[in-house]
Design a protein with these regions (language model features):
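Conserved donor-binding/catalytic core segment of Leloir-type glycosyltransferases
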Residues: 194-218, 224-235
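Acidic donor-binding loop of glycosyltransferase active sites
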Residues: 208, 272-284, 297
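Short hydrophobic beta-strand element within catalytic cores of glycosyltransferases
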Residues: 298-301, 311
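A charged, aromatic-enriched C-terminal amphipathic alpha-helix characteristic of glycosyltransferases
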Residues: 323, 337-366
Length: 374
């Protein structure tokens, strides 16, 4: 059985790329096809993977223009025909367009339908731009949506990364998912992190911690405004296009601290010292919330999306029900981290360990390789 792995692109090392590394561990002989690859942005282990790029990788200034070039996925992937009985795509956008050989299977592990295309990134459209830009954006979006739905029809079977994404695949593509396999989280590096909260975890004198890309849909604005209102300490790690707005919301409040882009080791240290991890956005899965629980820390999350699959209410965290400052502030006022057992948090995190992911995905792929398409 010949297999080929397809990944949208390799220009940033995030959760999707960590998932790719685990899929490669299952089928190390399978070639990995991707739009483009910037090796200097990835751990050395990626240099040993059988990565094959499209013609886009040969375009000029790929390092600077990688995000722009990602819009070429419909052209680049539509012409890709790997010699494999089973195509396994790890896709949000273009990778699901690859056609298998005649009689072959295309099994898509779907992270999400593209956020930028289906209005899933609140506050990131072009509605504030001048009319000609809006018109171009509308025309391009309509074309890309039609193409995205056609690409989804090339998939034999979908596997969703969460129940939340399963429902999104059904709503946008009209397709069912044959399995749900939660993505892998490297929990081992957090499990033995010493707690450095120094006895303040149960009161309001300890700090709250959040880490995320600074984008509007992450809703860090709610965390900032709620903590300012209550006089609670908040430490935020990350960078992104929303930084200027978030800093304006924080003003000169000394309780709100921006840490910038910090190392994984520093993130782990910050988590170990907090009294709770804030997770205020509507997320597809919730990798950072799992990492926080692996540190033995409870999570305060917006009660929708992937958070409902990664956090156990009253056991490893608590939810606020509306995406408003008032709702989050009310939850923060009633929250006491001494109500949560760190061992329960760590046990929950272990459900998403890489070995469990590899076992579950291998089982799902093996079954679906023998089944006819929809």
């Amino acid at each position: 059985m010949k297999r080929a792995i397809i990944h949208d692109y390799l220009y940033v090392h995030g959760g999707a790329e960590r998932t790719l590394a685990q899929v490669h561990a299952i089928w190390p002989e399978a070639p990995i096809h991707t739009l483009l690859h910037l090796p200097d942005r990835f751990p050395p282990a990626f240099n040993d993977m059988p990565i094959q790029t499209t013609w886009v990788n040969r375009l000029p200034a790929t390092s600077r223009l990688a995000r722009f070039y990602s819009l070429l996925q419909p052209i680049a992937f539509s012409g890709l025909h790997p010699n494999a009985d089973t195509v396994i795509s790890l896709a949000s956008f273009g990778a699901k367009a690859v056609r298998p050989i005649r009689g072959g299977r295309h099994l898509c592990y779907c992270f999400t339908p593209p956020r930028f295309l289906w209005g899933l990134n609140r506050g990131t459209n072009l509605s504030g731009h001048v009319a000609p830009v809006q018109m171009i954006d509308t025309i391009l979006t309509r074309w890309l949506r039609r193409w995205d739905r056609r690409a989804a029809n090339r998939v034999t079977h979908f596997i969703a990364q969460s129940r939340y994404i399963e429902s999104r695949i059904a709503r946008i593509y009209g397709r069912s998912s044959r399995a749900v396999v939660h993505p892998p989280v490297n929990v081992d590096r957090f499990l033995n992190q010493p707690d450095t909260a120094h006895g303040h975890a149960g009161g309001n004198d300890g700090y709250l911690f959040a880490v995320a890309r600074f984008e509007a849909y992450k809703r860090l604005d709610l965390a900032i405004l709620a903590c300012r209102r209550l006089g609670m300490r908040l430490r935020i790690a990350g960078l992104g296009v929303d930084e200027a707005r978030l800093r304006t919301l924080a003003g000169d409040d000394p309780n709100i601290q921006f840490l910038g882009a910090i190392s994984d080791e520093t993130v782990a240290h910050e988590r170990a010292g907090c009294r709770a991890f804030l997770f205020p956005g509507e997320e597809d899965f919730g990798l950072t919330a799992v990492e926080a629980q692996a540190c033995g820390k409870p999570v305060i999350a917006y009660g929708v999306g992937g958070a409902l699959e990664t956090v156990v209410a009253g056991v490893t965290g608590t939810f606020f029900s509306e995406p408003t400052t008032d709702a989050l502030a009310d939850t923060l006022l009633s929250f006491k981290s001494t109500d949560f057992n760190p061992d329960d948090c760590r046990t929950q995190a272990l459900r998403f360990a890489p070995d469990r992911f590899r076992t579950a995905l291998h089982h799902a792929i093996t079954i679906l390789e023998g089944e006819p398409g929809e």
